[in-house]
Amino acid sequence: MKKPLNSAEEKKTGDITKAEIEAIKSGLHSNPFALLGVHETPEGFSARCFIPGAEEVSVLTLDGNFVGELKQIDPDGFFEGRIDLSKRQPVRYRACRDDAEWAVTDPYSFGPVLGPMDDYFVREGSHLRLFDRMGAHPLKLEGVEGFHFAVWAPNARRVSVVGDFNNWDGRRHVMRFRKDTGIWEIFAPDVYAGCAYKFEILGANGELLPLKADPYARRGELRPKNASVTAPELTQKWEDQAHREHWAQVDQRRQPISIYEVHAGSWQRREDGTFLSWDELAAQLIPYCTDMGFTHIEFLPITEHPYDPSWGYQTTGLYAPTARFGDPEGFARFVNGAHKVGIGVLLDWVPAHFPTDEHGLRWFDGTALYEHADPRQGFHPDWNTAIYNFGRIEVMSYLINNALYWAEKFHLDGLRVDAVASMLYLDYSRKEGEWIPNEYGGRENLESVRFLQKMNSLVYGTHPGVMTIAEESTSWPKVSQPVHEGGLGFGFKWNMGFMHDTLSYFSREPVHRKFHHQELTFGLLYAFTENFVLPLSHDEVVHGKGSLIAKMSGDDWQKFANLRSYYGFMWGYPGKKLLFMGQEFAQWSEWSEKGSLDWNLRQYPMHEGMRRLVRDLNLTYRSKAALHARDCEPDGFRWLVVDDHENSVFAWLRTAPGEKPVAVICNLTPVYRENYYVPLPVAGRWREILNTDAEIYGGSGKGNGGRVQAVDAGGEIGAMLVLPPLATIMLEPEN
């Protein structure tokens, strides 16, 4: 316990006590702005500074005029004295020691940057541009270049910004506390872009916390380092007006959307095994997706994260594109390049939880600030991570502003929101007694619901054309319905039931499929209850599950035929499409983030055939309105053959107003069938627009010679078809 100051120790040096000097020197003073810098006195102006290592200090105006010499009042570098100024203004100190001389622009002689309106909007949770005010931003203040820093730490006793620019000394740039909001801020003159920095925080109980990265940092160091980095504002010259206007004007549910899911660190690598830069990715990935016919690229999280095997899902920097692939400007160039050729860019976004790394958000100011204090609410047992406190206004604002930031600054086309089910249920992955009911005694996380509704409302309200997609694995109602109709407000939802049932079916031996016919028909009972995306994602090809081709039943020929028929089934089925990288050419091995995809497989005809099929499926899906314009509406689907269990044959019709219908027929046993009758809506010639058994795709080349004749036999219209083995065909009327 500290000894109380006696009267001798309280003796003043000028207007400052020895105790105050000691508090500044030891980093325990919470408001150095009251002591340091330029101050007006009855006799004029005086200046005080703390410059460790200095023996002499003189004071200059910013334009270099000498205005006074300061007296050393403490040998550790404390100086004060009268200065010749006519008005209060920032000053620069010239410090000397032996033969060394250096200049220090006084951060304590500048006023605050944030204003009362910032405080007002922060308090009520309606500040929608926090990304321009919080964190580190370049600023020219009173003619001086520097960076403004701001961080939320309401329970801290003291917060300093430390970095390369002050030798990581927490006594040099102690921040100003705005008590109405709990935000600390400082303008640090002469700090330039590219400096590593963190926040040094003295907790509520006086304990010095581990140095914290900036929650709003727009750039970070490459792992294993974990400091934030001062970054210039983005100056990307955007050339994507046509792309953005298109998506802002259309009904996304009626557009073809085919998503290529990519892990940026392992799609391709350089020959030495290092990551491609954003510019290298742009030069290879964008043309590849254009050729393949995908409409969107969806990246697994590219926000800063310390641990490669987390794939980015345990992020410590929601506002910073990871340094693994270069600077943020590189990512902006990638998005711009994709938009110029009409490809959208989606980001996998993780607002459900955050890792407990000591430099991150956990226990940020010495209290449970971003997370719940009670582990029954604030700890995720599946991932050993912390759960955001969605009921706290500042936390909700942090996350919502992040969603807006990616749309605003990087022109992203949408966010796929990870682990929504874990956000919606208080008892998610918890046993009895391990969770706290809501105010009505239920298991629904009402705070999370309000957060998701507000996030979606603001994203769609401020950025027309941007979409949000929920990864939600339960039957929570109205996930993709508007908020004003009682929904969560997402644009789309992943159809996990489709993925589970269809993978189960196609992994079965064909001889057993007749007993599991409902696995492919049941999904149509709920296919239009949400706006669905059909996901064959990274989750299905990791953790011992095997790749998609490896999941298929049978010998190698049957595996390829099964996967081709499965892709044909999926691209003909109502819903938007998503396919994880490597599965388009039937990579045999499971995905690993440690290296590139097995691109060498493309030299083999069966693998190259699979890639050609996916390409042609995308082009067919995009060019035939019947296959996409009613993906989310029941009037665009009709069964033609639904109950042929014995032969494992399925057929349905896809339609759109004013467009030619497309019939999709799947023969899911290895039996070649001739003269198989399928009812069709109109008589006449129907063209075979796609056949997954074509030789060009690696199939046996069986089919209908390019067309069939539908005849009207007494009011019943249909055609006798050849059904290739383990294949999907698509037909379209010629007229």
Curated annotation (Swiss-Prot):
SUPFAM superfamilies registered for this protein in UniProt: (Trans)glycosidases, E set domains, Glycosyl hydrolase domain
TM region positions: none
Pfam families: Alpha-amylase, Alpha-amylase_C, CBM_48, GlgB_N
GO cellular component: cytosol
Catalytic activity annotation: Transfers a segment of a (1->4)-alpha-D-glucan chain to a primary hydroxy group in a similar glucan chain
E.C. numbers: 2.4.1.18
InterPro entries: A-amylase/branching_C, Branching_enzy, GlgB, GlgB_N, GlgB_N_E_set_prok, Glyco_hydro_13_cat_dom, Glyco_hydro_13_N, Glyco_hydro_b
Functional pathway: Glycan biosynthesis; glycogen biosynthesis
Keywords: Carbohydrate metabolism, Glycogen biosynthesis, Glycogen metabolism, Glycosyltransferase, Transferase
Active site per database record: 418, 471
GO biological processes: glycogen biosynthetic process
Any one Gene Ontology molecular-function term assigned to this protein's record: hydrolase activity, hydrolyzing O-glycosyl compounds
Keyword Glycosyltransferase listed: yes
Tree of life domain: Bacteria
Function field: Catalyzes the formation of the alpha-1,6-glucosidic linkages in glycogen by scission of a 1,4-alpha-linked oligosaccharide from growing alpha-1,4-glucan chains and the subsequent attachment of the oligosaccharide to the alpha-1,6 position.
UniProt cross-references to PANTHER family, sorted A to Z: 1,4-ALPHA-GLUCAN-BRANCHING ENZYME (PTHR43651:SF3)
Assembly notes: Monomer.
HAMAP family: GlgB
Family: Belongs to the glycosyl hydrolase 13 family. GlgB subfamily.
The protein's name: 1,4-alpha-glucan branching enzyme GlgB
Species this protein is from: Agrobacterium fabrum (strain C58 / ATCC 33970)
